[in-house]
Amino acid sequence: MHSLSLISLALLSPLLVNAQLSGHVGPLTSSSSKASTKTCNVQDYGAKADKETDIGSAIEKAWDDCAEGGVVYIPSGDYAMFSRLKLSGGKASAIQLDGIIYRTGSDGGNLFMIEHSSDFEFFSSTSQGAIQGLGYEFHKDGSLNGPRLLRFYDVTDFSVHDVALVDSPAFHLSLDTCKNAEIYNMAIRGGDSGGLDGVDIWSENVWVHDVEVTNKDECVTVKSPAKNILVENIYCNWSGGCAMGSLGADTNISDVVYRNVYTWKSNQMYMIKSNGGSGSVSNLVLENFIGHGNAYSLDIDGEWSSMSTVSGDGVQLNNITVRNWKGTEEDGAARGPIKVVCAEKAPCTDITIDDFALWTESGDEQTYSCENGFGSGFCLQDGDGTSSYSTVITETAAPTGYEASSMSNDLSTAFGTDASIPIPTIPTSFFPGATPYSALAGAASGNAAKATSSATASRFRHRRGSH
């Protein structure tokens, strides 16, 4: 168990205080304690590991017995799931997925939806549990109308860890109006198509760390409303890339940190996307990014043409820090590594771009383009946003220190949309040189009961030695 008092928090660096977690994250009770209270093995409720019998009713019955204190246990084996589950309420409970669940049936909705719950954990004690969505069965016909794999709504004090989410017909993992969550030690692997988001967050006080995402849309993305979000040690491995948005009317996002993000062969390293709208984004830090082979690098686009224009003057962006970015981009002349386009009636203010060194993989020049963005660094102009401007700077010399490490598991090609995607092994490295905050649960012990005790309770773990 790790915890950090608010007094200790105040003594840490200003960065820690101003723009990340506001308190503890994760469940309040360890899964081992929950299991000792009660364990509901789904096989005792009719589940069969035959890859044919619908496991849904067995999970529902087990949940009814263990939701108020206990663990719903899904042993190793292959299970079919035709049902679309909505598990509501409960406290001091967990779902231990050590088997593999295969989506069957063509209904949409959510394969798993957890709502109105607290002190909850969804995990695998072996790090081999998975949900296989078999989304290609929809995607090969051009359809995105299948179910999302895992969605949380109005859940507090919870974690999701050591599970793989594979080939969702739609989104993989969504956190909707949740609080005090920790997401870690996960592999998410989707098809090469838009609409197959990895992790989407519109919640408060959430820590996402040590997660790998492969898809063609969002890697780990913050949506509105959101506050106190910390995203660390992220591996966007042939993905859409991390982002914020799309942002529309009444945007309300603040105190967000992305740190140690490695992006390979993706659409962008980080994008903030809007077109019109209202509200604000404030206190955003994007630091320690490495990228290779991406179409865009830093892409702040207040006139994003891929979304319909929303009524309003634009979303106000304020106090954004971008620092320590290294690597290469695909074509720096066609799509330069810095693009900051802000609305004329809602200019971006107090933006800092520092220690930023990327170079083109094609050709011998790259551009930096800024429009109505005010602050310091590269093409940004000093000012308070009372005047408008647009400028493009062309760079013909590679910046000093742009070279950056790569990851040994970088994919050589994307996964398609017309064949089954294999279930991956959860990696033990997510960013060059960074040690994951938690060992995989399956590495702790071969004994499932002992492995569950590795889950943390009421913790606020801070970055070790990174201040």
UniProtKB/Swiss-Prot annotation:
BP-aspect Gene Ontology terms: cell wall organization; pectin catabolic process
Keyword Cell cycle among record annotations: no
UniProt main location, coarse: secreted
EC number: 3.2.1.171
GO CC entries: extracellular region
Range of residues in the leader sequence: 1-19
MF GO annotations: polygalacturonase activity; rhamnogalacturonan alpha-L-rhamnopyranosyl-(1->4)-alpha-D-galactopyranosyluronide lyase activity
Key words of the record: Carbohydrate metabolism, Cell wall biogenesis/degradation, Disulfide bond, Glycoprotein, Glycosidase, Hydrolase, Polysaccharide degradation, Secreted, Signal
Subcellular location: Secreted
Active site: D217, H292
Enzyme's top EC category: hydrolase
The keyword GTP-binding belongs to this UniProt entry's keyword annotation: no
List of glycosylated residues: N237, N252, N319
S-S bridge residues: C40-C66, C219-C236, C342-C348, C370-C379
Catalytic activity, reaction form: Endohydrolysis of alpha-D-GalA-(1->2)-alpha-L-Rha glycosidic bond in the rhamnogalacturonan I backbone with initial inversion of anomeric configuration releasing oligosaccharides with beta-D-GalA at the reducing end
UniProt function note: Pectinolytic enzymes consist of four classes of enzymes: pectine lyase, polygalacturonase, pectin methylesterase and rhamnogalacturonase. Hydrolyzes alpha-D-galacturonopyranosyl-(1,2)-alpha-L-rhamnopyranosyl linkages in the backbone of the hairy regions of pectins.
Family statement drawn from the similarity comment of this UniProt entry: Belongs to the glycosyl hydrolase 28 family.
Protein name as annotated: Probable rhamnogalacturonase A
Protein species of origin: Aspergillus oryzae (strain ATCC 42149 / RIB 40) (Yellow koji mold)
The encoding gene: rhgA
